[in-house]
Amino acid sequence: MENKILGLHHITAIADNAKRNLDFYTKVLGVRLVKKTVNFDDPGTYHFYFGNEQGEPGTILTFFPWEGIGKGTAGAGMATHIGYAVPQGSLDFWKNRLGEHQISLQESEIFGEKLISFNDPDGLQLQFIETKDDRKTWTTTDINSEHALKGFHNITLSLKEADPTLKVLTDILGYSLQQQHDNRYRLTTDSIDTANIVDIIADKNLPYGKNAAGTNHHVAFRVKDDNVLMEYREKVLSAGLDITPKIDRDYFFSLYFREPGGVLFEIATDNPGFTVDEPLSSLGSALKLPKQYESYRSQIEQTLPKID
């Protein structure tokens, strides 16, 4: 299994106000700020990584909070719904908690799984699904391990047509189609038990989305190490798709390619991980800069928006 895609690695989205984004995910949803750094291409913008206690792949939701970018529109060619696994029996807790924060939600069932759906402050669509999941959580004073988010359950891609993307997911990334109901498809990989589901909604009449606050930027799939990463680069190239060279993102190595439906896919390694520059006990507590920006730390710190 080590040379396979190991489900989701991380998901990256766009926000507007940095403090509002940080407060919502750490204080309302109770996930850990695993890393506080900056955008590699725009060091005046934060890059927040939220996850579980260990910052494990499959739990990491990251954000570029571009202040003043305005609201985006979810639509075709995007990952439109991010599904989190929550402990069995915890949905009532979350319904009450979200209600206390004046967050409206909808209850539904997809492929036999009960879930709640709601939006974050920028409009990003989140779903909480009750499921058996043994991953360790990050707990807070008011969210204990019986209720805390476990990490990703699934990601939903919205597309004009399903077949070209299904081919990439099955032929290149090793997923298999498990269920289909009308225009909704569910794919899984048996290489891992968690964060291993990709759903597709296909609708030829769905307008294309507009990338800005409240929308997904890219979806990253997980591999063990650099050797496996480069094997997948060859697979993507052999399928006739363009893909980047290997990129060092400090906490993982990455490749990027755009699948035929328009979604930006990344493949990212487990190594070296988030403890490469700070200990587990203090993850996310200090501003960490890519080495090319360290000599500009004072200017960057003055430029970044206030979040304390």
PLM features: what roles do these ranges have?
Residues 146-233, 237-243:
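Surface-exposed interaction/gating patches
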Residues 35-38, 50-83:
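Conserved donor-binding loop and adjoining core beta-sheet/short helix segment
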Residues 1-2, 71-73, 142-147, 207-210:
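Short, flexible, solvent-exposed loop/turn segments with mixed acidic/basic and small polar residues
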Residues 2-4, 7-16, 34-37, 68-160, 181-200, ...:
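Vicinal oxygen chelate
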Residues 27, 64, 97-98, 170-171, ...:
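Short amphipathic alpha-helices in soluble, non-transmembrane regions
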Residues 64-68, 138-141, 201-206:
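Short amphipathic beta-strand starts and helix->beta connectors
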Residues 13-57, 100, 106-108, 112-117, ...:
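Core segments of cupin and vicinal oxygen chelate
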